[in-house]
Swiss-Prot record:
LRR repeats: 144-170, 172-197, 205-234, 303-334, 335-360
Gene3D superfamilies: 1.20.1280.50, Ribonuclease Inhibitor
Protein name in UniProt: F-box/LRR-repeat protein At3g59210
InterPro entries the record matches: F-box-like_dom_sf, F-box_AtFBL13-like, F-box_dom, FBD, FBL60-like, LRR_dom_sf, LRR_FXL15/At3g58940/PEG3-like
Domain of life assignment: Eukaryota
Keyword set, alphabetical order: Leucine-rich repeat, Repeat
TM stretches of this protein: none
SUPFAM superfamilies the record matches: F-box domain, RNI-like
F-box domain boundaries: 6-54
């Protein structure tokens, strides 16, 4: 038997070993330098460098001076050992104690080495200016900058001709909307944009305009103000995730290619207080804002997720809910302190809805809660559910509170669905319980519910430990929509 048969790893070429080491953090890869002389500097030649010194286990413990010096020396040494070798990916995560005078040379070094994937997660305690050369790289394909309380950027000339993915967390644009517009115009092939904790509520107007963009994620920082004007001119975006205070107006909302969207628009505390006052004084609730134009711009979406804040906003800040002709999959998030007032009109506006998902069923009972639930006990009243095209109904977080009264409310709501949704073919309940008998009991109770649902309606009750499936008995199926 030759030596290579005995030691397969050591017989591999250096470039292949470097690829293997790239799957480890640089700190872990450095441990292989103890194996032999051949391995001594091999870890520094890997194309992907990952430096992580964040105190993830005990974030309250500050980095000691000795550790800081050791980390800085380690990064300096690795970059020096690489010489002029190309860097494919550079990821840096460091907390308090690592100053910008240490970080900036590392960033500039990687840019000189043609880095294509740059990820920076630096100290949240420092308010620092990011080197302008980061936004003038001809090699960057992916750029990620964070975390919360991230850097300030003053953009003069943006030139990122190859950048396809951009993720910014808490980055402050010194020139506001002008700087943001410069950034977008300097990324001619950008396909994916993610902006987290963006504070744009002080801008005169907020606009995202790109003909190339395909995925857009926008989470705006919580604020006591409403954006004055928000526009989206993104005709090729297929995925849109948006969380923000409702804007005063939406002059342009262009999502011609939209397939999937997640919307989390909310009112400010002042708007909520005004809405409660109007509700107490008048029988009819007056609008305190208007989200109609935003909804009109996304009404061709196929898959939609609405947060509980959005449900409240649609009730108080939307004059008309447009028709969602293409919508086939809708997810609704519920909150025990917020009602379902906007839900009936929303469901009536989804003529081709096939799958309806409730992320929790507990909600606030009000005298305008609508005809979707049983809050007012109107058992014989006409319900929008009676004309629902939904074939698949999913209930998430069932039994989450582990409270008997809440469980009874949830069960009554599910029974209401079965009794009124004529096209239902599948009911799936995700039960938050580790006790198998709980699932058996719920499944048995649902088998006794008179229903207008399809004769072949299948009921599934699922937990982490067990999955029960059954079909409604023919004797309990209501003919011609007659309610027992």
């Amino acid at each position: 038997m030759d030596d290579c048969s005995k030691d397969i790893i050591n017989c591999l070429p250096d470039n292949l070993l470097c690829q293997i080491l790239s799957n480890l953090s640089t700190k872990e890869a450095a441990l292989t330098s103890l194996l032999s002389k051949r391995w001594r500097y091999l870890f520094a030649l890997v194309p992907n460098l990952d430096f992580d010194v964040l105190p993830s286990l005990h974030p309250e413990v500050a980095m000691q001076d000795q550790d800081q010096t050791s980390f800085i020396d380690f990064v300096d040494r690795v970059l020096k050992l690489r010489g002029k070798d190309h860097i494919n990916k550079f990821s840096l995560k460091c907390g308090d104690g690592i100053e910008d005078e240490d970080v900036f040379p590392w960033i500039l070094n990687t840019l000189r080495h043609g880095v294509s994937d740059l990820s920076l997660h630096v100290s949240p305690s420092l308010v620092y200016w990011l080197p302008s050369k980061v936004f003038a790289s001809k090699t960057l394909v992916r750029l990620k900058i964070g975390p919360k309380d991230g850097p300030r950027v003053k953009l003069r000339n943006v030139c990122l001709p190859k950048l396809k993915t951009l993720n910014l967390d808490s980055v402050v644009f010194e020139e506001g909307k002008i700087g943001f517009a410069k950034l977008l115009s300097g990324c001619p092939v950008l396909e994916e944009l993610s902006l987290l904790n963006l504070a744009w509520d002080r801008w005169d107007s907020c606009s995202v305009s790109s003909k190339i963009l395909k995925r857009l994620t926008l989470y705006c920082a919580h604020s006591s103000r409403n954006p004055k004007s928000v526009s989206f001119d993104t005709p090729n975006v297929v995925y849109f995730e948006y969380s923000d205070n409702i804007a005063n107006k939406y002059p342009k909302v262009n999502f011609d290619s939209l397939v999937e969207a997640s919307i989390g628009i909310r009112m400010t505390k002042v708007q909520k207080a005004n809405a409660r006052y109007v509700s107490d004084v008048d029988e009819e609730t007056e609008m305190v804002g208007n989200a109609t134009d935003l909804l009109m711009g996304i009404c061709n979406v196929k898959t939609l997720y609405l947060s509980y804040d959005t449900l409240e906003t649609l009730n108080l800040c939307c004059q008309v809910i447009p028709v969602f002709n293409n919508l086939t999959h809708l997810t609704i998030e519920s909150h025990p302190e917020l009602g379902w007032e906007s839900l009936p009109n929303l469901l009536k506006s989804c003529p081709n809805l096939g799958t309806l998902v409730f992320q929790g069923l507990l909600h606030k009972a009000t005298d305008r809660c609508g005809d979707v639930c049983m809050c007012q006990g109107l058992e014989n009243s006409h319900s929008c559910l009676s004309s629902s095209p939904v074939k698949c109904l999913k209930i998430l977080k069932f039994g989450e509170t582990n409270d008997d009264d809440d469980m009874e409310i949830e069960m009554e709501q599910i029974k209401n669905f079965l009794e009124k949704m004529p096209n239902l073919e599948q009911l799936i309940i995700y039960y938050e319980s580790s006790i198998d008998n709980d699932l058996v009991r719920v499944s048995s109770q649902l088998q006794e519910v008179p229903t207008v649902a399809s004769l072949k309606c299948k009921i599934q009750v699922i937990s982490d430990n067990l999955s029960l499936s059954s079909t409604l008995p023919i004797s309990l199926s209501m003919e011609n929509g007659f309610h027992l």
